[in-house]
């Protein structure tokens, strides 16, 4: 496994009875980047994150973090990770700061500065008399995120951190997550079912559906797949690719399957390309300009609705 990956899984599987919640998952989270795990509700995102944190054991497969197997190295690896999985058990009759002080004591976080820094980062006041029971859902989500970053972890694993937030809160969360990565060098794995937010935040995206990883690419690569292009339907895409490279010195294309190829350079003369294909024995049934939105692309890949 590549040491450039902070998280790497190999055939990670979780099975309950005859039902596979996660099936042969291979994800690769690169150092210093934000990885967005995107999928509809029930796709297997939370189960995957729980296995990455040792909260549930995989049925089969392997998790490596910083190049080391998680199993057997939990005491060394897990203290370097901050996580937000479901809702932490905060005390309702204490303030946010008082709650964090208790967790800081349990975790050996040395001083109040770490608590204040975490609260500042998520936009909650350090000196506040409001009890946790009086918090809105959005404030509770912010406090949970503050708890995840309080001990200054190298890696953050955040399950749906924007749940319950209003648009302003979502923008603020997006901003501080980006800051954690860009200014503080954190590696971040974040899950969501909201495509628009993942596409604004993530450097790399993994699409998960019914427990299986359907795609794993950089955001730029996925945007290229969904951008305006010329679609060719023909008898042999491998041969078509060779013709494009040899005759037109062009490699800005993507092969979809044996019979469908997308050319992303719209400046090339389509007529001459079709002629070259035919002269080299290819049967061309379609050559058309096409455009697919990123949302349409994700819906096509996952086979339907469920991603906002």
For the regions a language model picked out, list residue spans one by one.
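Short coil/turn motifs at beta-sheet boundaries
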Residues: 2, 95, 138, 223-225, ...
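Short, Lys/Arg-enriched, disordered terminal segments
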Residues: 1-5, 304-308
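Alpha-helix N-cap/helix-start and coil->helix boundary motif
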Residues: 13, 97, 121, 195, ...
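Non-catalytic alpha-helical coupling and interface elements of nucleotide-dependent molecular machines
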Residues: 105-108, 303-307
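Generic structural signal for individual residues within well-ordered alpha-helical segments
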Residues: 78, 100-101, 116-119, 171, ...
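ABC transporter nucleotide-binding domains
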Residues: 4-9, 14-190, 195-209, 213-215
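ABC transporter nucleotide-binding domain
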Residues: 175-264
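Short, charged/small-residue-rich alpha-helical element at the C-terminal edge
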Residues: 228-301, 308
């Amino acid at each position: 496994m590549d040491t450039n990956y902070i998280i790497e899984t190999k055939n990670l599987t979780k099975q309950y009875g005859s039902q596979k919640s996660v099936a042969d998952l291979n994800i690769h989270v690169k150092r210093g980047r934000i990885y967005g795990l995107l999928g509809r509700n029930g796709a297997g995102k939370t189960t995957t994150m729980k296995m990455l944190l040792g909260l549930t054991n995989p049925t089969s497969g392997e998790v490596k973090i910083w190049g080391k197997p998680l199993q057997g190295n939990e005491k060394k690896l897990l203290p370097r990770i901050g996580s937000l999985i479901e809702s932490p058990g905060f005390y309702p009759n204490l303030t946010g700061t008082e709650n964090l002080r208790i967790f800081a004591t349990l975790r050996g976080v040395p001083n109040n500065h770490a608590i204040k820094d975490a609260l500042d980062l998520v936009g909650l006041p350090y000196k506040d008399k409001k009890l946790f029971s009086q918090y809105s859902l959005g404030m509770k989500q912010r406090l949970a995120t503050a708890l995840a970053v309080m001990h200054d972890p190298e890696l953050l694993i955040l399950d749906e951190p924007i749940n319950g937030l209003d648009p302003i809160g979502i923008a603020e969360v997006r901003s501080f997550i980006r800051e954690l990565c860009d200014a503080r060098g954190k590696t971040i794995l974040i899950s969501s079912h909201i495509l628009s937010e993942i596409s604004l935040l993530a450097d790399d995206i993994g699409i998960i559906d019914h427990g299986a990883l359907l795609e794993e690419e950089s955001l730029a690569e996925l945007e290229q797949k969904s951008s305006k292009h010329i679609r060719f339907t023909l008898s042999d895409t491998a041969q078509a690719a060779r013709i494009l490279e040899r005759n037109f010195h062009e490699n800005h294309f993507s092969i979809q399957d044996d019979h469908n190829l997308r050319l992303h350079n719209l400046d090339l003369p389509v007529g001459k390309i079709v002629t070259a294909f035919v002269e080299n024995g290819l049967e061309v049934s379609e050559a058309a300009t096409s455009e697919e939105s990123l949302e349409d692309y994700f819906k096509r890949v996952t086979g339907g609705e469920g991603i906002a």
